[in-house]
Regions:
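A conserved glycine-rich beta-strand in the N-terminal activation segment of trypsin-fold
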Residues: 162, 167-233
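Generic beta-strand structural signal
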Residues: 151, 171-174, 260
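Structural boundary/hinge residues at secondary-structure and domain interfaces
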Residues: 2-161, 207-251, 265-309
């Protein structure tokens, strides 16, 4: 009898542990994450879209896309997307998976010479989880790709290499979200950011701003003026960079709405002033007003006075 009680007790403890573990995993998977809190502070731009296909189709009709598509990072992205789409399961192509959801794209400068993107993609349904699982299985089976998984600070990272193009990307899953980039350095930076805890949004100043709820708005565009000079430095001569950095210090950040009208692009929104000492904004800070005593000496027939003080 005592042996049977001990056996039942051990079985109960094991069963309770399994239930608790399963519940914890389920609760973690249900936890909603603000993707803005995962974006590193080094991002020069962050673009949030909720209609990927429509934005891409409209951009492809503009002259801006002709210039943007010539960038190596854009060409690599298009080539990888085409290869991934070729192994996507059934008729559920990547465009369908990416469409009609809020996706973040952060733009970073690495090593003062390269532009890299990070994509933050929510997985919102059981069907999408099934699609991703089948896609990863097809990648493993495809001779066009090689896949290797590794652990980094408690996160399982997967490196996928396109053997035909010689390009690669790294991704990991975090609370029903996929974080993906061609730069493993940026992915690892995001993992370190998560492990530090107490995540704060890079766009915390604009928490209540969402232009996507308005008609004809294609994206929210966050501008980090403190990182913007590094991006502009890729296109501007070095001797002009001191002026670029100084002018960029007029604002700290901005949240803009993106609208497209045929071949025109419109950005409109709000900016916050830079508060650092020595910035352009600090130089323009209003000083204490002083009376214009020269008025006492002016003739009564003075029609106009120009004063530079």
């Amino acid at each position: 009898m005592p042996q049977r009680i001990v056996f039942y007790f051990i079985a109960f403890v094991v069963l309770a542990s399994l239930v608790y573990y399963g519940f914890s995993r389920w609760q973690d998977s249900r936890l909603k994450v603000d993707l803005w809190t995962l974006v590193p502070e080094t991002a020069a731009f962050v673009v949030e879209t909720n209609n990927h296909s429509e934005l891409r189709e409209h951009l492809e009709e503009t002259a801006l896309w002709e210039s943007f598509s010539l960038l190596p990072v854009t060409q690599r992205f298009q080539e990888n997307m085409a290869m991934l789409d070729s192994v996507a399961p059934g008729n559920q192509r990547l465009d369908r998976f990416l469409d009609k959801k809020n996706i973040l794209t952060s733009i970073h400068v690495l090593g003062k010479t390269d532009v890299e993107f990070v994509y933050y993609i929510p997985v919102v349904s059981v069907g999408e989880h099934r699609f991703l699982r089948t896609l990863t299985e097809n990648i493993v089976k495809s001779p066009a790709f090689t896949e290797q998984s590794r652990e980094y600070q408690g996160m399982l990272l997967t490196d996928v290499t396109n053997t035909q193009l010689g390009t690669s990307f790294t991704y990991f899953s975090y609370h029903n979200n996929i974080i993906l980039s061609a730069s493993p350095v940026l992915v690892e930076e995001i993992v370190r950011r998560i492990n530090r805890g107490k995540l704060t949004s890079i766009a915390a100043d604009y928490k209540k701003v969402n232009y996507l709820s308005q008609a004809d708005v294609y994206a929210n565009v966050f501008v980090n003026y403190r990182a913007l000079p590094d991006l502009l430095g890729l296109f501007v001569q070095e001797d002009l960079m001191p002026q670029v950095r100084y002018l960029s210090s007029f604002c700290r950040n901005a949240m803009l709405e993106l609208k497209l009208d045929r071949n025109k692009l419109f950005l409109n929104g709000f900016s916050n002033p830079e508060t650092l000492e020595g910035s352009f904004q600090a130089q323009l800070h209003p000083s204490k007003p002083r009376p214009l005593e020269i008025k006492l000496l002016l003739p009564t027939r003075t029609a106009m006075l120009m004063h530079f003080g």
